[in-house]
Amino acid sequence: AQKRISTAALLPDIKGKVTAERELENHGGDAFKKSETFEAQFLVSWELDLWGNLRWARSASIAEYLQSVEAQRALRMTIVAEVAQAYYELVALDTELDIVKQTLKAREEGVRLARIRFEGGLTSETSYRQAQVELARTATLVPDLERKISLKENDIAFLAGEYPNRIARSRLLQEFNFPETLPIGMPSTLLERRPDIRQAEQKLIAANAKVGVAYTNMFPRLALTGGFGTESTSLSELLKSPYAVMEGALLTPIFGWGKNRAALKGKKAAYEAELHSYEKSVLTAFKETRNAIVNFNKIKEVYALRANLERSAKSYMDLAQLQYINGVINYLDVLDAQRGYFDAQIGLSNAIRDELITVVQLYKALGGGWKQ
């Protein structure tokens, strides 16, 4: 709307006016004298943009409009990124809960075996009680994870503009696919994609245009006004009495107590501030992108290492359980192996989650993703 208003200011303003007037006069006599006047006219006013004042104002309005467009795009991109990250975190919690429930079953089996061996005199009561402690400790993790899952579902519903409800999902974290490489072009293409940089650029353009407006306000302004119409004392004779009026007005500042110069100085200061803000936005964009790329590459290394750790911990736990059944080691060694495998599983799940989140962060850093 503001863009259209500023554009219209460059064009002549045309208005129409129709009037009818009736007067009754009595100058001391008994009868009233009636007089009627009918008039139809077009009024035209036009400010000539001699110094570019109106053009600068139009440029500022267009830039401010584009600011709002980029702000909307930035908000949409942020919401998409936040929803994606929250969803990956939710599925990671699902995976962790699944791991805990599997571990809980293993702990229950461990308690059963420890009780049988204790009652058979093969082990002490300590091993049996320790197995019960581990079972109880693992069981406490279930309601806490269920609480976190419900809260995360509420977060996603809020971001989606919905009332809290269950979020539909059908995948475990390990089933998501993520890119092996990042086909990113030259960093300068960031300037073409990131809405925050585009918004900062439009703010800079608007600030520069406002400097132009303040500067041209110190020069005279020429306005033309005209009227074209017809006037008559009889409605039937209205079109037979045309007239036309044209005048010009030159308005120039003479003594304004330094108001215009102060305004110009203020707009220049605002421009300098927007220039620094633009430079900061560009530097922030490159920093965030670089951080996202580093995180993506390093998290892949972390994932590979944790996957290897998970496999090794699984082999160690299987061996420890076999040796315990054969009486080679005590139950504390089995518990230690089980704890190690549990931690390795959670660590691997977190690595997958972190890798997916880095893709989301990279999507946001690149202003909405990249082309394959």
Go through the PLM ranges and name each one:
Residues 1-12, 25, 41-60, 70-77, ...:
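A glycine-/polar-enriched beta->alpha junction
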Residues 1-2, 175-205, 253-254, 279-282, ...:
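Bacterial Sec-pathway N-terminal export signals of envelope proteins
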Residues 16-22, 224-230:
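Transmembrane beta-barrel strands of outer-membrane/channel proteins
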Residues 34-38, 242-244:
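Residues that define the transmembrane beta-barrel architecture of outer-membrane proteins
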Residues 54, 63, 70-186, 295, ...:
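Periplasmic alpha-helical coiled-coil/stalk elements that build and connect Gram-negative outer-membrane
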Residues 126, 330-350:
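Short terminal targeting/anchoring segments
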Residues 145, 195-196, 274, 351:
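Metallo-beta-lactamase
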Residues 164, 178, 326, 347-372:
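Acidic, low-complexity, intrinsically disordered peripheral segments
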